[in-house]
Amino acid sequence: MSNDFLFTSESVSEGHPDKVADQISDAILDAILAQDKYARVAAETLCNTGLVVLAGEITTTANVDYIHVARETIKRIGYDNTEYGIDYKGCAVLVAYDKQSPDIAQGVDRASDDYLNQGAGDQGLMFGYACDETPELMPFPIYYAHRLVERQSQLRRDGRLPWLRPDAKSQVTVRYVDGKPHSVDTVVLSTQHAPEMSQEAIREAVIEEIIKPVLPSHMLAETKYLVNPTGRFVIGGPQGDCGLTGRKIIVDTYGGAAPHGGGAFSGKDPSKVDRSAAYAARYVAKNVVAAGLARQCQVQVSYAIGVARPINITVYTEGTGVIPDEQIAKLVQEHFDLRPKGIVQMLDLLRPVYEKTAAYGHFGREEPEFSWEATDKVLLLREAAGLAGEPAKAFA
């Protein structure tokens, strides 16, 4: 790719139907983990007009009222009126959970010599990424796409824009010059709204109250704004589209700036490497960049079902590393335990912290529960790489 280019990422609000499904799945996971931290959970959700279906595989000693958890999640998001797309009070909730297959369980539970040799819950490949485009070490387009829909939710909830409804989407196109974010080329923001609102009033409020307070002002000189470009967005949420768990995997990660192994996160307990290893790969990549070993870092790990140790740990820095990629990969293997149980232990993942991850991105958020965002390996990595002193600030 040339060093001068346009790149686009999108995000969706907590009220988007797929995100409603993700949040219900993770709320159920949290409710189970609060009682049984060793539960096996694969909770899938479908939500449509007036209907929520809970299905998947759960093996647990916990006693959870799944229907109540689903309704409370829908209520928290803001769907308390059928006119908005679904009403938590009146929607039907169907429960169809089974137990985890014993064929899968035996591979995960089997340990050859110690606790840390629990096998992976499935085969697969996972990616982690970090770069110095933002202080949070996330790609600029996805970071700000998240902040836009987060702002939409804030203004809806605090009543400053009372005509906003829960469903919304954002898209940010950034112009890169010399490989760095230079300016915002285009912003698309579509938001569900009350039927009496005019397009002109919506456009003005969205630009002035949502977009401009979020994006860096010096990057907006020639920005094109597309607000509700269809002209009307009254029907939304699960009424506008059927929502399913796991359909926003690029929104959940890096907005297309890094590859994705294909496995979704929400509703899965941390024995599933789709989730836990992707979190660990982000932790590795962020520490590599924060340590000043590279300006960007992509980490790939892969697993075989029932086998504890990763098949591969591969690091790419796209020529930005101060030491060879192979040397960074060796440091990663020495200082990060990427066996499934090692990850759970390293990141303290047996906690009910997952519902918060299910909207506005799993990465690049300085939430106290997000242990995978810590940069506590920086000095260790620098010392092991033979670099003296504290790293320079990664974000330029």
Swiss-Prot record:
Keyword check for Transmembrane: no
Catalytic class of the enzyme: transferase
Q: Which reaction does it catalyse?
A: L-methionine + ATP + H2O = S-adenosyl-L-methionine + phosphate + diphosphate
Q: In which pathway does it act?
A: Amino-acid biosynthesis; S-adenosyl-L-methionine biosynthesis; S-adenosyl-L-methionine from L-methionine: step 1/1
Where does the record place it?
Cytoplasm
Question: What Pfam families is this protein classified in?
Answer: S-AdoMet_synt_C, S-AdoMet_synt_M, S-AdoMet_synt_N
- Cofactor note from UniProt? Binds 2 divalent ions per subunit. Binds 1 potassium ion per subunit.
This protein's record includes keyword Transcription regulation: no
List, alphabetically, the GO terms of the cellular component aspect.
cytoplasm
Listed binding positions for K(+) are E44
What EC number(s) does its UniProt record assign?
2.5.1.6
Q: What is annotated about its quaternary structure and interactions?
A: Homotetramer; dimer of dimers.
Function text: Catalyzes the formation of S-adenosylmethionine (AdoMet) from methionine and ATP. The overall synthetic reaction is composed of two sequential steps, AdoMet formation and the subsequent tripolyphosphate hydrolysis which occurs prior to release of AdoMet from the enzyme.
- Protein's name in the database: S-adenosylmethionine synthase
The top of its lineage is: Bacteria, Pseudomonadati, Pseudomonadota, Betaproteobacteria, Burkholderiales
